[in-house]
Amino acid sequence: MINILKDILYKSYSYLAFPFFYLGWAIKNSYQPNKTIKEEESKPPKYPKEWSDLFIHSYNNEHEKVLEIIQKEPNSINSVDSLNWTPLHVAVSNKSIEVVTLLLERNIEISIKRYTAFHIAACNGDLNIIEKMITMNRVPNGNILSNDMETSLFLSITNNHFEISEKIMDYYQSSMNSNEFKKMIDQFNVHGVSPLIMSVLRKNLKMIKKLIEEGDADINSFKKDNSTSLHCAAIIDFTEAIEYLLDIGGIELMNSINRYGNSPIHEAAIKGNFKSIQTFINQLKKIIIKNNCSDGDSDKDKLNLLLLEIIDKKDKDGSTPLHLCCNCVNSDNIENNLKSCKVLIEEGGVQVNGIDSGNATALHILACVGEDKSLPLVKYFLSIGSDPTIENKYGWTPIHQAYNNKNIQIYQLLLDHLKLTNSTYKLDIEKKRVFQSSSTSTSSSSSSSSSSSSSSSSSSLLLNKEELKLKGIERLKNVINGIKKGEFKNVIVLSGAGISANAGIPPYRTKDGLLAKNKQFSFSMEILEKHPDVFYQAIRDHFYPIIKASNDNDRDDGISAGIKSTKSHYFINDLNEKYGCLLRNYTQNVDPLQERTGTPTDKIIHAHGSFDQWYCTVCQKQYTDKSDRIWREIGRGGLPFCTEPECRHVIRPNVVFFGEPLSQDFRVNTITDFRKADLLIVMGTSLIVYPFASLVNDVASDVPRLLFNFESTGPFVNTMDLERKEKLKQQQENESGESSNDNDNNELIVEARGNRDIVILGDCDKGVDYFNTLFNSF
């Protein structure tokens, strides 16, 4: 759930970077409950049952008792608890400085992977312990990362411990080689946030300057959504950072585009951050003058044109910053939106009647927004020459927009403006919206019959389908050429249940799937604990193979043993084995069919876990089902129990249950892999389960994306896909009396989507056959 919330918040750039608990605080509150009743204050504090006396005394800063224990048992100093914490971690978390000093003197291990004691001190802002560890030269490697890929430097910056951040930087700069130091400076976390970006988000200009000037931080570093430090500064209205970053990064940084197709000034416009917009314009003027050696009014027009190329640029949706300023429906301060518009027009030279990709002006946008917010902006735009008679691509003016959105005050204001300006525009307020493509006349003709209009629309739709098909095949050939020539070196495949359907494992959500066949079942601890028989019966029915009579050489070797890998599985393996371009296969499947094709395990990440591993939820004993004991027990209708004599609880597969986070491998690898990806292939997944579904947007905006699936989904969907889906649904209901998600249509659809995507819609294996046939045809 946390990962889903983070992905939802990307657009607003509310970065959830603060650790969800301070490590020291967590121990106190987990192990020492609040005492609200007087009698409880006399009770001894509670600690984890696993904690030895050494851990307890270390936590409580009991120097003499700790010394006594480690003198008797020297090896106990490096013992760890279930969190992999040593007595040093525990002492640091509670700021037990005397015990920390003692343990450091006794050569306790300081480089335990993930959170080191140094990480904890940096996170908690404990300057004394940081200084003590530095003075004693007992500091771990600066590039040791936490579970979320955070360095100690990153954690100190995240929590605004500037003095500690300075000391950490200074220490490692003198003790590391330059390459290792640079690696630490630019190390991003699992969300792609670097120390520089975090310093911007924390509005710490001193740290920004120190990272860049002393650490040579990469000013072009970007988050998971491709937002740079300048994007972030624009969003939080950090004008001092904007000025400084632009001085260094220049126009190249200003033109950087994030996942949403926005430059930094687009983001400032969305927020109505007029101060940031003003700073952008002022700094850009200085940069343009400097770059073009302009020294007078003779170059003023050139300067303005160069400026407009940057501040009037359209985003992915065809909107300029001015349009975005006017889309103020969610604005908390409409005055800021008005000031932003004034800055863009009066100081940036943006045209008041400039149009977006839909031929709409800023006034069109305002006419759609509730008049309680947009009325002051409408008055301003009319006062400086905005034309309310310009028609958008549907033939509507701002007057039509206001009328049909029931913004009566704006509607009347626009009508009054027509009278005042003696406009000759002939207003037909009942005019219907009619899409006017670039190939048709912009003038509307009321004499056109409805039949001819319908015919034109139909032929236009057919033309679009044919164009999309031709463009899709052309793009597919380009992808194939790229694979043949070795141009694609880091291909990522996202695969789902659809690629295993032809192996006899139906996707969960179809009429033959696991969820439909057993309404009581869910992948949840609640079902496993309360109804283990229901849980394992569903697992047995869905995953355990129906083994037919076979010869002596065949053997039931566990899950899906009688099920063979599909053409889609072998296609993924070919990317690795034949073409050497597979970087990683991220799969939602918990079956081992991909491994059976010969794909190396290090090339596969099971995002939702795998049935290869099992464990006991009580004693935590791990099981690898090499001997097939677990599946044989499930296959005969029994329950798999823990083999520990004192435990004997029902064990569970190492798959992700509802509400559980995805694996550490998934979180760490995705951020690094998707930055390298040069081709993304999506196969057999509905892209509705997050955070897996969000991965499709994590490749760079110029990376081709190829979808093999029964139907278009996620960002690949267009309006024609919706029409096809509705038509197929009606057809299936007419034939069987019920709706189905199964693919009864043998026809493959190959089409282009957007400016980079290709879809091959239909059965995944047939899509692979088509790909391979085309591959071998030239």
UniProtKB/Swiss-Prot annotation:
List residue spans for each ANK repeat: 83-112, 114-142, 148-178, 191-221, 225-255, 260-289, 317-354, 358-390, 394-423
In this chain the Deacetylase sirtuin-type domain maps to 465-778
Cofactor(s) in the UniProt record: Zn(2+)
Domain of life, per the record?
Answer: Eukaryota
Q: How is the cofactor bound?
A: Binds 1 zinc ion per subunit.
Q: Name one GO molecular function term.
A: NAD-dependent protein lysine deacetylase activity
Parts forming coiled coils:
none
Keyword Disulfide bond applies? no
Tell me the segments the record calls region Disordered. 438-458, 727-746
The record's listing under Pfam families reads: Ank, Ank_2, SIR2
InterPro entries, alphabetized: Ankyrin_rpt, Ankyrin_rpt-contain_sf, DHS-like_NAD/FAD-binding_dom, NAD-dep_sirtuin_deacylases, Sirtuin, Sirtuin_cat_small_dom_sf, Ssirtuin_cat_dom
Which portions of the chain have biased composition (kind: Low complexity)?
A: 733-746
Which residues of this UniProt protein bind Zn(2+)? C616, C619, C642, C647
Q: Which EC class is this protein assigned? A: transferase
Its Enzyme Commission number(s) read 2.3.1.286
Catalytic residues (UniProt): H608 (proton acceptor)
Q: What does it catalyze?
A: N(6)-acetyl-L-lysyl-[protein] + NAD(+) + H2O = 2''-O-acetyl-ADP-D-ribose + nicotinamide + L-lysyl-[protein]
Keywords, A to Z, come to: ANK repeat, Metal-binding, NAD, Repeat, Transferase, Zinc
Q: Which PANTHER family match?
A: NAD-DEPENDENT HISTONE DEACETYLASE HST3, NAD-DEPENDENT PROTEIN DEACYLASE SIRTUIN-5, MITOCHONDRIAL-RELATED
Write out the similarity annotation.
Belongs to the sirtuin family.
* Functional description taken from the UniProt entry: NAD-dependent deacetylase, which plays an important role in the regulation of transcriptional repression.
Q: What is this protein called?
A: NAD-dependent deacetylase sir2B
